[in-house]
A protein has these predicted regions:
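Short acidic, S/G/P-rich loop/turn micro-motifs used as interaction or catalytic elements
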Residues: 14-17, 39, 55-62
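Acidic, metal-coordinating helix/loop segments flanking the phosphotransfer/catalytic sites
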Residues: 36-52
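A short, hydrophobic beta-strand element within the central beta-sheet of small alpha/beta folds
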Residues: 77-90, 98
Length: 122
């Protein structure tokens, strides 16, 4: 997928990290839409509105997992990437452990490559 066309919802309460992640993703052509809290995230999560939703657990893994499950229950095809402090006991396949921006970018690009392959194979 062309990053210039990809819309990413970034849910992150930590202003410094959020700004850093937004900057890196925008530099690589992604359209980034920040959500600062759970309420704002839920109001923006409409089926098909985003190509990817990135959720930072921000020290609240239970709340982040609940949000991921809520997103998937509303749109089972929605790609969701969870950023967590630790990967222990996470039921999700698509997560990274407390990232640095390069790791986040690499993971997002690999997710979109997987989407392209799936679309081409269909």
């Amino acid at each position: 997928m062309n990053p210039n066309l990809a819309k990413v919802l970034l849910i992150d309460r930590d202003q410094e990290r959020r700004n850093e992640r937004i900057s890196v993703l925008k530099q690589h052509g992604y359209k980034v839409f920040p959500a600062l809290d759970l309420q704002q995230a839920r109001s923006r999560c409409k089926p098909g509105a985003f190509d990817l939703i990135v959720v930072n657990s921000g020290g609240q893994p239970d709340m982040a997992l609940e949000l991921c499950e809520w997103i998937k229950s509303n749109d089972s095809k929605q790609a969701v990437l969870l950023i967590a402090a630790t990967g222990n006991q996470l039921p999700h396949r698509d997560y990274i452990v407390s990232d640095v921006p390069k790791q986040l970018l690499d993971r997002i690009e690999s997710l979109f490559k997987g989407v392209e392959v799936a679309v081409k194979a269909a």
